[in-house]
A protein has these predicted regions:
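Glycine-centered signal
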Residues: 1, 19-22
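Bacterial N-terminal signal peptides that target proteins for export
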Residues: 1-9
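Bacterial N-terminal signal peptides
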Residues: 9-18
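Exported/periplasmic ABC-transporter solute-binding proteins
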Residues: 23-107, 112-291
Length: 291
């Protein structure tokens, strides 16, 4: 065998060995909520050091997308920032699936304002009039505010696309089950997109997960009815439930998890996994001590 043939043989052997190693690793498919995608990626990366025989492939697309993938049997774990709807559960069961819900953390669904907005607090009722169909509040002056740089004081309503769990949860918690969003909202693909648009738009108001907050936007203090004290969104107020728009963060499996999927979920709920969700700006499912 000459030198060239030996080199080709060595490369071929390396490729075969790498392929065999990749095939030996168990792949866990994880898809869904844009709110959870960053922490899900952090979990997946950290878990490589825990179990090198497992690879976790993470993608976003929204809670509805992840749930649909679970129903169709194309993922092992569906991330969601809302609970599955009954019609989704029924569809899953009709396809032989048995979705099981797992709470992996909590989030404060924050209301974002431009830095120059003078608003100190907003009530759930005010938000409903801002975002809800037939809501009468369309400009900042109607709630006694004048926002610098906002031409005509007309509100720019920043929302999420309707396959988003954040969209669904805000509708349920703020507008109520029987009320839809008013026309004219700017529906963003991702959580970060909401915050970015609010930062650049003096007239804007938007909602997104607390983990996407930056120093360039303002967080509104939210009250349940306008008469009581408002509560700021934080890890603590999401955890203790005092923030009016706190929500659980969920993962769904098809049936009770077993094997490597169970081991991965158990690790997510361990102190190590919960410290990662805390560092990403979400509330853990219980008190944890982190380095």
């Amino acid at each position: 065998m000459n030198r060239k043939q030996a080199l080709i043989a060595a490369v071929a052997t390396a490729i075969v060995s790498f392929s065999a190693l990749a095939e030996a690793r168990e792949l866990i498919q994880n898809k869904g909520s844009d709110t959870l995608v960053n922490v899900a990626q952090a979990w997946a990366e950290a878990y490589q050091k825990v179990d090198s025989d497992v690879a976790v492939a993470v993608s976003g697309g929204g809670s509805g997308t992840g749930i649909a993938a679970l129903i169709n049997g194309t993922v092992d774990l569906a991330n969601a920032s809302r609970a599955m709807k009954q019609k989704e559960i029924d569809l899953a069961k009709s396809k032989g699936q048995n979705p099981i819900e797992h709470t992996v953390g909590f989030d404060a669904l924050a209301v974002y304002l431009h830095q120059d907005n003078p608003a100190d607090s907003l009530s759930i009722a005010q938000l409903a009039e801002v975002y809800g169909e037939e809501g009468e509040t369309e400009n900042w002056s109607q709630i006694g505010l004048e926002v610098p740089g906002c031409k005509g004081q007309e509100m720019v309503l920043v929302s999420r696309q309707n396959n988003s769990g954040t969209y669904a949860y805000f509708r349920k918690a703020v507008l109520g089950k029987r009320r839809d969003y008013k026309m004219g909202t700017r529906d963003m693909h991702g959580s970060k997109d909401v915050v970015d648009l609010v930062e650049k738009t003096p007239c804007a108001i938007g909602y997104s997960g607390l983990a996407y907050a930056t120093d360039h936007v303002k967080l509104a203090c939210i009250s349940k009815d306008g008469s009581g004290e408002c509560v700021m969104p934080s890890v603590e107020t999401a955890s203790d439930g005092s923030y009016p728009i706190a929500r659980p963060l969920l993962m769904y499996t098809n049936g009770e998890p077993t094997g490597k999927i169970k081991e991965y979920l158990d690790w997510i709920l361990s102190d190590e996994g919960q410290c990662i969700i805390l560092k990403k700006g979400y509330a853990p499912v219980r008190d944890v001590t982190c380095n």
